[in-house]
């Protein structure tokens, strides 16, 4: 089944992720309509796909031939395209750059649930070849994760015209927390957060989170009942002009200590792991790239007879987690999440 898509906005990864994936999956998707707050960009992309540019996203979503929307970028309209897609019964692919306010998470969940549309959130780290292969190794060779370490280094001027530095930091933290939860196969049960901000800035330039994954009463008695500890650090303290310093001797994006071994990941394709037999290096370049994995999963969710709500629940859980992390920073203590 070929889906006719409406495209709203262009992400930072449009040229490297979404555009190549749409071309590779031309038998599953057809871009039929394009909206962008900058009309010249909409016209250019529409020409690439022989699609129709629109002056308004509601007008585009009201078009009867459009079956689903790729919502890739927030602009002046915020999350209004999600409301419009629900009004017109269009499936929603919600890109990782969309700004979703934590305090509106419950309203978003209720809106999508009542509309009955398919909803998929973009969690690119989950579907990177290295992440998927690690999950296989956890199930077959390495055993359950006991400790996870994640580090992300951003340039100090990491904001954009649409995003403030704090919003970028929050988005990174939500994605990193979700990544740890995905790898461990357990929800976050508690968070202890610390932060630092420079004297000449009102925004945080460093944040560290200590997470406990699992270990709740609901997990007791299961094979995966022991909690996993995750340590996340995300910093934007190096000026963008110091390009060499930003990338100097960065640690692996994720390190995982499992029952039977240790793994080091760098996205999208690098995975090195160790067990009693020694060092193993995975060759993952031939695997489907992240963009194709994401869009293939979206196509499956739209065409499936079974409606999946897990992505929406994960988005709401991530937004709740960032709120709890802020509270932990303010109160200087470990906070527990409602399960």
What positions do the PLM features span?
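A contiguous active-site-proximal alpha/beta segment in oxidoreductase catalytic domains
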Residues: 76, 100-160
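Hydrophobic residues in well-ordered beta-strands that form the structural core
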Residues: 55, 94-95, 119-121, 265
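Contiguous beta-strand/loop segments that form the cofactor/metal-binding neighborhood of enzyme cores
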Residues: 171-268, 295-304
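Active-site loop of classical SDR/Rossmann-like NAD(P)-dependent oxidoreductases
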Residues: 13, 284-296, 313
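Conserved acidic residues
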Residues: 32, 67, 146
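N-terminal Rossmann-like dinucleotide-binding module
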Residues: 1-48
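C-terminal helix-rich "cap/oligomerization" subdomain common to oxidoreductases
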Residues: 46, 59, 68-71, 117, ...
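Beta-loop-alpha module in the N-terminal Rossmann-like domain of NAD(P)-dependent dehydrogenases
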Residues: 38-40, 49-111
């Amino acid at each position: 089944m070929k889906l006719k898509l409406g495209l709203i906005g262009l992400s930072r990864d449009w040229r490297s992720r979404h555009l190549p994936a749409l071309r590779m999956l031309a038998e599953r998707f057809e871009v039929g309509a394009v909206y962008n707050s900058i009309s010249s960009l909409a016209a250019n992309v529409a020409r690439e796909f022989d699609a129709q540019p629109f002056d308004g996203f509601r007008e585009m979503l009201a078009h009867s031939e459009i079956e689903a929307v790729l919502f890739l970028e927030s602009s002046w309209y915020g999350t209004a395209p999600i409301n419009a897609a629900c009004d017109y019964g269009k499936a929603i692919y919600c890109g990782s750059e969309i700004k979703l306010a934590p305090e509106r998470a419950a309203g978003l969940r209720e809106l999508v649930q009542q509309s009955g549309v398919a909803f998929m959130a973009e969690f690119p780290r989950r579907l990177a070849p290295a992440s998927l292969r690690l999950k296989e190794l956890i199930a077959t060779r390495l055993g359950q994760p006991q400790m996870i370490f994640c580090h992300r280094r951003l340039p100090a001027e990491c904001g954009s015209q649409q995003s403030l530095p704090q919003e970028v930091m929050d988005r990174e933290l939500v994605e990193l927390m979700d990544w740890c939860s995905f790898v461990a196969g357990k929800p976050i049960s508690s968070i202890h957060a610390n932060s630092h901000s420079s004297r000449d800035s009102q925004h945080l330039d460093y944040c560290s989170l200590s997470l406990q994954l699992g270990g709740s009463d609901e997990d007791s008695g299961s094979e995966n009942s022991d909690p996993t500890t995750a340590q996340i650090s995300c910093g934007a303290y190096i000026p963008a002009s110091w390009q060499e310093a930003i990338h100097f001797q960065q640690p692996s994006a994720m390190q995982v200590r499992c029952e039977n071994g240790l793994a080091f990941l760098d996205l999208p394709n690098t995975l090195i792991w160790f067990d009693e037999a020694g060092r193993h290096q995975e060759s993952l370049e031939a695997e489907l790239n992240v963009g194709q994995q994401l869009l293939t999963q979206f196509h499956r969710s739209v065409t499936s007879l079974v409606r999946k709500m897990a992505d929406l629940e994960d988005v709401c859980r991530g937004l709740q987690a960032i709120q709890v992390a802020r509270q932990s920073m303010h109160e200087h203590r470990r906070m527990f999440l409602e399960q």
